């Protein structure tokens, strides 16, 4: 009886080890895809932007099964401050105020407490998963000239990618504010442990009022 119980336990552990990457990816895909910006109002976004946020860069780790399960329970829907779309690489994510493990599993995260869409430098961080179609994995394929769209449900901000580069993780000056209006997208250069970061920088080309037509075009429901 004891041997049979042990065999069952070993089998269960083995199955969990085999299927845990698929389970983990499934949870992250659900977290980052089941909600869209259309579920929010401009007044919600404005209220969320006024709240304090944490920027706990040092605590951020590679997504593990444990962190994904915790993140699924703890990510803050009241931290949503907008949405980002990069049509050329099929990125469409919510933007969360504050960088922490839970928010990074649900979308892109802001990196400074004072950043404002359409003004100065607007840096965003995102995870690079083993399934490179998820979160900021596709950003690795961004090229000069590609368009990046941001919205706070009041305006649509259109940026054009002007530069892509790989930097060391210590080069934190890329998130500093600037006089020119730009967006800076940052992710790890590979889905495993690394000290390098891939960066895509875009210049603000146009700001216009967000209409329902524009929202449906760039931020469609999933």
From Swiss-Prot:
Activity is enhanced by Zn(2+) and strongly enhanced by Ca(2+). Inhibited by chalcone, a precursor of several flavonoids, which blocks the SrtA active site. Residues 1-7 are cytoplasmic. Changing residue 127 to A: Lack of transpeptidase activity. Keywords: Cell membrane, Hydrolase, Membrane, Protease, Thiol protease, Transmembrane, Transmembrane helix. Disruption phenotype: Mutant is defective in processing and surface anchoring of internalins and several other LPXTG-containing proteins. Mutant is significantly less invasive in vitro and is attenuated in virulence in a mouse model of infection. Deletion of the gene does not affect expression of the genes encoding LPXTG surface proteins. A double srtA-srtB deletion mutant has no cell wall-anchored proteins, and is as impaired in virulence as a single srtA mutant. One of its GO terms (cellular component) is plasma membrane. Pfam families: Sortase. Its EC number is 3.4.22.-. CDD domains: Sortase_A. The record marks 197 as: Transition state stabilizer. Changing residue 188 to A: Lack of transpeptidase activity. Does not bind chalcone. GO terms for biological process: proteolysis. Residues 29-222 are extracellular. The active site is at residues 127, 188. The chain crosses the membrane at residues 8-28. InterPro entries: Sortase (IPR005754), Sortase_A (IPR042007), Sortase_dom-sf (IPR023365). It is a single-pass type II membrane protein. GO terms for molecular function: cysteine-type peptidase activity. Transpeptidase that anchors surface proteins to the cell wall. Recognizes and modifies its substrate by proteolytic cleavage of a C-terminal sorting signal. Following cleavage, a covalent intermediate is formed via a thioester bond between the sortase and its substrate, which is then transferred and covalently attached to the cell wall. This sortase recognizes a Leu-Pro-x-Thr-Gly (LPXTG) motif, which is cleaved by the sortase between the threonine and glycine residues. Involved in pathogenesis. May regulate the rate of synthesis and/or the stability of a subset of LPXTG proteins. Belongs to the bacterial sortase family. Class A subfamily. This is Sortase A. It comes from Listeria monocytogenes serovar 1/2a (strain ATCC BAA-679 / EGD-e). The gene is srtA.
């Amino acid at each position: 009886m004891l041997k049979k119980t042990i065999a069952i336990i070993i089998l269960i552990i083995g199955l969990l080890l085999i299927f845990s990457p698929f389970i983990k990816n499934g949870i992250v895909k659900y977290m980052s895809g089941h909600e869209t910006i259309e579920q929010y109002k401009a007044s919600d976004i404005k209220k969320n932007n006024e709240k304090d946020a944490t920027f706990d860069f040092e605590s951020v780790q590679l997504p593990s099964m444990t962190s994904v399960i915790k993140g699924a329970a703890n990510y803050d829907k009241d931290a949503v401050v907008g949405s980002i779309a990069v049509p050329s690489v099929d990125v469409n994510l919510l933007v969360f105020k504050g960088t922490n493990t839970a928010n990074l599993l649900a979308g892109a995260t802001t990196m400074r407490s004072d950043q404002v869409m359409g003004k100065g430098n607007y840096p965003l961080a995102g995870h690079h998963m083993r399934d490179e179609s998820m979160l900021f994995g596709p950003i690795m394929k961004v090229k000069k000239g590609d368009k990046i769209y941001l919205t706070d449900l009041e305006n649509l901000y259109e940026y054009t990618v002007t530069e892509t580069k790989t930097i060391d993780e210590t080069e934190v000056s890329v998130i500093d504010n600037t006089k020119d209006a730009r967006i800076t997208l940052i992710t790890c250069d590979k889905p495993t442990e690394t000290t390098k970061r891939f960066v895509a920088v875009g210049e603000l080309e146009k700001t216009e009022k967000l209409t329902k037509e524009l929202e449906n075009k760039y931020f469609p429901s999933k």
